[in-house]
A protein has these predicted regions:
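Cytosolic juxtamembrane N-terminal segments of multi-pass membrane proteins
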Residues: 2-31
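Short, low-complexity cationic-aromatic patches
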Residues: 14-16, 31-42, 69, 125-138, ...
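Generic recognition of long tandem-repeat/solenoid scaffolds
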Residues: 21-28, 103, 136-140
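Conserved beta-hairpin
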Residues: 25, 80-114
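Alpha-helical transmembrane spans
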Residues: 26-92, 181-183
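Short loop/beta submotifs within extracellular cysteine-rich repeat domains
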Residues: 32-34, 101-104, 110-111, 144-148, ...
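Phosphoinositide-dependent membrane-docking surfaces
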Residues: 101-102, 113-129
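A membrane-cytosol interface segment of integral membrane proteins
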Residues: 130-183
Length: 183
């Protein structure tokens, strides 16, 4: 086993459970950015609520003509509110259990839940997402297809930790993959 795999430390505030042939990592989404996003979300939605109450008062205000233009802003406001709730309540769990690699975001739904037979994975690797400072854990299946397993990891060391520990649990020998983040 390469020395690199032995040197990867678990990220702070992650709950790790390792048993022979299995692995589980869980972490909460909350970070300080949530505290800055809440006032913005309240301000955004407050303006929309103020507009809605002004527009609906007997439909006498000329702003009622702008009501249709507010619909996209309402969707953004609802999305921001839901995202704030997810930041406070959600956690992500990655586990190997009963021959399956399971990625689950809960308790509130979020895209990216996965359940993949672990025997289909030939290689795991980390990719830096273009246009942002986040990382993805990807897998190469036995039939040569690339599959994104987890997105939105905020630092390279967390992504590397998952790659290394899952490869160890799956008895996968680490190999270079075209397009992966250099070590």
């Amino acid at each position: 086993m390469p020395a690199r795999q032995l040197a990867v430390a678990a990220p702070e505030k992650w709950h790790i459970d390792t048993k022979p042939g299995s692995f589980s990592a869980r972490w909460r989404w909350f970070n300080l950015s949530a505290l800055f996003l809440i006032p913005f979300t309240l301000f955004w939605n407050g303006i929309l609520i103020g507009m809605a109450t002004g527009v609906t008062e007997g439909f006498t205000h000329p702003e009622r003509l702008l009501f249709g233009l507010a619909v996209p802003h309402v969707w953004v406001g609802l999305g921001l509110a839901y995202y704030c709730l997810c930041l406070f309540l959600n956690s992500t769990k990655v586990e190997l259990k009963e021959g399956m690699l399971i990625v689950q975001h809960s308790p509130l739904w979020w895209r990216g839940n996965r359940k993949i037979p672990s025997g289909e994975l030939q290689q795991l690797f980390v990719v830096e997402k273009r246009g942002s400072v986040s990382y993805e854990l990807c897998g190469l299946t036995r039939d040569g297809k690339r599959q994104t397993l987890l997105t939105g990891l905020s630092d390279e060391s967390s992504a590397r930790f998952l790659e290394v520990r899952l490869e160890q649990a799956l008895n996968i020998t680490d190999q270079a993959v075209a397009g992966e983040l250099r070590r």
